[in-house]
Regions:
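Residues in flexible loops and secondary-structure boundaries
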Residues: 31, 66-69, 121, 130, ...
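Class I SAM-dependent methyltransferase SAM-binding "motif I" and its flanking Rossmann-like core
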Residues: 88-164
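A short, acidic, amphipathic alpha-helical segment used as a generic capping/interface helix at domain edges
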Residues: 73-76, 150-156, 181
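Short beta-alpha junction loops
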Residues: 35, 116-118, 170-172
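A contiguous loop/helix-start segment that scaffolds small-molecule binding in enzyme catalytic cores
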Residues: 2, 81-82, 158-181
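Class I S-adenosyl-L-methionine
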Residues: 1-109
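Secondary-structure junction/capping motif
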Residues: 41-43, 113, 117, 179-181
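Short, solvent-exposed coil/turn linker segments
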Residues: 62, 128-131, 181
Length: 181
């Protein structure tokens, strides 16, 4: 069984009771560090805090692992209980939806444990949630890749009088200066 467990938005203590029970019952635990990071980061001390509270050794799943080697995780989950921890809510990123689809195709059972995400926490801004238009992702540009689709989406939201939630890309392995948004 693959448990995809949302950790919420704060620190290691924001996991739900159901999520903590699932993690403690798993043979293997992965922490996805590609789409987002907990506020405490993932340096060795922060990882040790997670491991101490959860009572499990945690393997960090970076972008390469999530995009290229996640089938290894799914093969493990076919034989034993595996937890895949994600910041926020599991379905806050298409990456995790893809993981569920791939697991189902491989015959791996999946249980999703939801938590708070940026998508429902934006109400703290005081803006009305039902007045948000399409959410946009703003990636890092490279010399070869400079997408501009988010400009049009933002313009459409503005034209309709809607707020826009902007999700900024992060560079987990390159944490200096402006690499984290």
């Amino acid at each position: 069984m693959l448990y995809i467990v949302g950790l919420g938005l704060g620190d290691e203590r924001d996991i739900t009771v159901r999520g903590l029970d699932a993690v403690r019952g798993c043979s293997k635990v992965y922490m996805e560090a590609y789409t987002s990071l907990l506020s405490l980061g993932l340096d060795p001390a922060a990882l040790a805090n997670l491991e101490k509270l959860y009572g499990k050794e945690i393997t960090v799943a970076d972008r390469e692992m999530v995009e290229e080697r996640v089938d290894q995780v799914l093969l493990e989950a076919a034989d034993t209980d595996v937890a895949f921890l994600v910041v926020g809510d599991p379905f806050g990123a298409t990456t995790h939806t893809d993981l569920v689809v791939r697991a189902k195709k491989m015959g791996v059972q999946v249980k999703v444990i939801h938590n708070a995400s940026v998508m429902n926490a934006i109400g703290v801004c005081g803006l009305q949630l039902f007045r948000y238009g399409e959410t946009i992702s703003i990636p890092f540009f490279t010399e070869e890749w400079r997408p501009d689709s988010f400009y049009e989406k933002n313009s459409n939201n503005s034209r309709l009088g809607l707020h826009t939630l902007c999700l900024f890309d992060i560079r987990v392995k390159d944490q200096h200066g402006n690499s984290l948004a």
